[in-house]
UniProtKB/Swiss-Prot annotation:
Protein name as annotated: N-acetyltransferase 9-like protein
Family, similarity comment: Belongs to the acetyltransferase family. GNAT subfamily.
Spans through the membrane: none
Species, as recorded: Schizosaccharomyces pombe (strain 972 / ATCC 24843) (Fission yeast)
SUPFAM superfamilies: Acyl-CoA N-acyltransferases (Nat)
One annotated GO molecular function: N-acetyltransferase activity
Main location: cytoplasm
């Protein structure tokens, strides 16, 4: 999103910055890893395609992306939002956190009669039944940085930014959702710790869906 192009979320030892051109090469090298491709349900891209993707993400109004940096010399602190991109080394990158905005109809909406005589009433009903879901994705790329509690802090800081910046209100987000492989117990625990509840199991993809309703 354009809204976070000049933003840093500073948590001391963890720093969130917008995905920039300087990050692409390291990100591309990460995504050559077959395990990460499987965990993120991603297909490998060429380097040129990765640069095109970064440029697209920076202006996409339905996708919010931050690169996560690790600064082991600083202590953890509550997230603060800065109106500039903090100077940093690309070598400090450890992952990313994203949110996609999607429209969703309430259960049963497809059952309405769409005959011409009922068109106006149906359209009005459908409009009122559509809500926005913020679907989150978290990746910590390298194993040595996993299971250290970073993921919980990253998602917490990300949601703090989405709420306090006004994005959640302006985009009329009703709830947050995450999809996690059913065997990825650490990630499931992470999101449950942050208040997410499991709402669905998808047997075809073998993943669970967890959701968190917004409170304001």
């Amino acid at each position: 999103m354009k809204i976070n192009q000049n933003t840093t979320v500073d948590c001391g030892n963890l720093i969130l910055v917008p995905y920039q051109k300087c990050h692409v090469l390291k990100y591309h090298n990460w995504m050559k890893n077959e395990e990460l491709q499987e965990l993120t349900c991603s297909e490998p891209l060429t380097l040129d395609e990765e640069y095109q993707m970064q440029a697209s993400w920076s202006t996409d109004e339905d996708k919010l992306t931050f690169i996560v940096l690790l600064n082991e010399n600083d202590e953890a602190k509550k997230p603060s939002i800065l109106d500039h991109v903090k100077a940093h080394s690309v070598e400090s990158m450890i992952g990313d956190v994203n949110m996609f905005l999607t429209e969703e109809y309430a259960d049963g909406i497809e059952e309405f009669d769409d005959s011409p005589s009922d068109a106006n009433a149906t359209n009005a009903t459908k409009e009122s039944e559509v809500h926005i879901v913020g679907e989150l994705e978290l990746m910590i790329a390298e194993p040595q940085n996993r299971r250290k509690g970073y993921g919980t802090k990253i998602v917490d800081a990300f949601l703090h930014y989405v709420e306090s910046s006004g994005i959640a209100k302006n985009k009329q987000i009703l709830k947050y959702r995450v999809k996690v492989g059913s065997q990825n117990k650490p990630s499931i625990r992470l999101f449950k710790k942050l208040g997410f509840s499991q709402v669905k199991y998808n047997a075809y993809f073998d993943h669970v869906e967890l959701e968190l309703m917004r409170t304001s």
